[in-house]
């Protein structure tokens, strides 16, 4: 993170020096940037803190469910350190796609091109769904061999299989968040993520002492579905509003 910050600062300094050489200045640019950046930063810090609290509560909840300390940490490690990395690994392509999507949608929104916005969003969600469903099928079919090949663990394969049906929801949520950022909904998108993290803390605290790992799997499914439903609903409303404000042809 420190190296990334230094690189971004250096690139910003170079760009700023280049644009100082000529051209019109943008009034109140710093104030406008901070108006977007500060709420996002505060929301990101809040979500990170809540996620950390959730991860601290998981082993304690598993221990309260009757597991020994070693078994509780083992169960937590299998889910978070083994199964989830395998399930989420293919989504690195979608994260790159979501980042590339932001300027495309922003340009279309500023230009008032409703047709382009609809086409981009529809195409990306459709292709993401195909990719996610294919990934889920492969994970379901090869969960056992993957667990044994990568971790030499049948338990890891079992949890990969249990998490595989959640892949379409997780991957679609990634692309949906990218679309929302491109359409200027960063703050609302982050608010949904903070709500998701808060809900995760409450459910982990309430369910894990009673249901153990089964309760944690329920929390993962429930939170991902709630997050995607809220994000997708916001995306539909944002696209409709953009199209309602479409600039008439000259």
Annotate the PLM regions.
Residues 1, 32-48, 81-84, 88, ...:
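Residue-level signature of transmembrane alpha-helical cores of multipass secondary-active transporters
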Residues 1-9, 158-182, 188-204, 208, ...:
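Short runs within selected transmembrane alpha-helices of multi-pass transporters and secretion channels
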Residues 9-44, 238-250:
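Interhelical loop/hinge segments that connect adjacent transmembrane helices in multipass membrane
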Residues 20-33, 69-73, 102-122:
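Hydrophobic, small-residue-rich membrane helices and short re-entrant helix-turn-helix hairpins
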Residues 45-89, 147-149:
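Helix-terminus/linker motif at the lipid-water interface of multi-pass membrane proteins
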Residues 87-111:
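Helix-loop junctions and terminal segments of transmembrane helices
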Residues 124-136:
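Selective transmembrane-helix segments that form parts of the transport pathway or gating/packing helices
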Residues 134-152:
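Short membrane-interface helical motifs at transmembrane helix boundaries
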